[in-house]
Regions:
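A cross-family phosphate/adenosyl-ligand binding-site feature
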Residues: 1-12, 22-108, 119, 241-246, ...
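Accessory alpha-helical/coil subdomains and C-terminal extensions
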Residues: 102-103, 111-116, 122-126, 133, ...
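Hydrophobic alpha-helical bundle architecture
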Residues: 268, 290-301, 308, 312-313
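Glycine- and acidic-rich phosphate- and metal-coordinating loops
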Residues: 280-289
Length: 363
């Protein structure tokens, strides 16, 4: 079977630690093992539509293993099938997928590596139907991508969140306060749950378990009766009260994910103060969780994903995403991943562990 001689690569969606590590692994492996040339498209699918690119080689991916972000740039507003175009002072949306295909063909490419989360995989599935062979690589700090046990980016974000919680502990103890720490995660509670457990959180609120403010307040009061005059509350941005709604910070027109969550921490803190008159403070970690040097675990996982993706290219195993199952790297069809998310199951051992530790989950 003849291996491809020229491939493209892009990074889509939000950035996270480990993107450069996976770019490096793909480029080095396809060059060293298969003598394949690589074109890197800039700013996600925007680069494919607008023909913005750089040629990648062993020299320009050297030294990027530990660098955060992505040397290719990224975008979560560049869906080729609903592409934003400024006309008469406002944005309208057009199908420019034919232009993406034209760019692909003009470069003489035989396959495209798409690195991203659920939105990127959904677009990758659609664009593969236009005769662009795809290999997908999963990334997200939210760990919510269906089909893989873990995504790179998650461990780095978990480390950052846990270190922040560790630091907040000391000021919480000193001032006898309830400290509310909000983390990202969208509609999946993995980051809040795992950082809450790792950081010794007393209360953890996630999207999958609607919370009762009375349950939270009772936990805080019980801790006070036991001589613990502070509490650490970790809340995922997608958490919501029982019978209530998530807090939406804003809506971004034209984005594949138009709803921007944020601010649930302020609601929780205000409700606690109103009900039991204890001093609360809010810390929203936000984009801090996306930045910085990837953890060693993420560097290793990203490298494994990149090498495996290169091998799938050589075998022409297109239409698949590399994934981690247990300790093994496997492939799963992208059409089984697109449009699905991986949330915390209610029988998760992490939830059972938290309850065994006496952690309040808001229910």
């Amino acid at each position: 079977m003849k291996t491809p001689k020229r491939i493209g690569i892009l990074t889509g969606g939000g950035d996270c630690p480990g993107l450069n590590a996976v770019i490096r692994a793909v480029v080095k492996t396809v060059i060293n093992d298969y003598d394949i040339a690589v074109v890197g498209f800039l700013d996600g699918f925007e680069g494919l539509v607008e023909n913005k690119f750089i040629k990648l080689n062993s020299d320009n991916v050297s030294g990027i293993l530990t660098r955060g972000g992505t040397i290719l740039g990224t975008s979560n507003r560049a869906d080729p099938f609903r592409y934003p175009i400024l006309e008469a002072g406002k944005y309208v949306y057009r199908d420019r997928s034919d232009q993406a295909l034209k760019t692909f063909e003009e470069h003489g490419l035989e396959a495209l590596v798409c690195i991203g989360g659920d939105g990127t995989m959904a677009v990758s599935q659609k664009i593969s139907e236009k005769s662009i062979p795809i290999v997908g690589i999963p990334k997200t700090i939210d760990n919510d991508l269906f089909g893989t046990d873990v995504t790179f980016g998650f461990d780095s974000a978990l480390t950052t969140a846990t270190e922040a919680i560790d630091k907040i502990h000391t000021t919480a103890q000193s001032h006898h306060r309830v400290m509310v720490i909000e983390v990202m995660g969208r509609y999946a509670g993995w980051l809040a749950l795992c950082s809450g457990i790792a950081g010794g959180g007393d209360i953890i609120l996630i999207h999958e378990i609607p919370y009762k403010i009375d349950s939270i307040c009772e936990t805080i009061k019980q801790r006070k009766y036991q001589g613990r005059y502070f509490s650490i509350l970790v809340v995922g941005e997608g958490a919501k009260p029982e019978g209530g709604e998530m807090v939406v910070k804003k809506r971004v027109e034209g984005s594949p994910e138009p709803i921007r969550l944020g601010g649930i921490s302020h609601k929780v803190a205000d409700d606690i103060e109103d009900k039991i008159q204890v001093e609360t403070r809010v810390t929203i970690l936000g984009h801090l969780l996306r930045g910085g040097v990837p953890s060693p675990a993420d560097r290793l996982l990203a490298t494994r994903f990149g090498v495996s993706a290169a091998q799938q290219l050589a075998k022409k195993n297109f239409g698949h995403m590399v994934a981690l199952r247990g300790s093994n790297i496997v492939t799963v069809p992208i059409d089984e991943v697109a449009g699905k998310s991986r949330t915390v199951p209610l029988d998760s051992p992490y939830l059972s562990m938290a309850r065994s530790l006496g952690t309040c989950l808001g229910d």
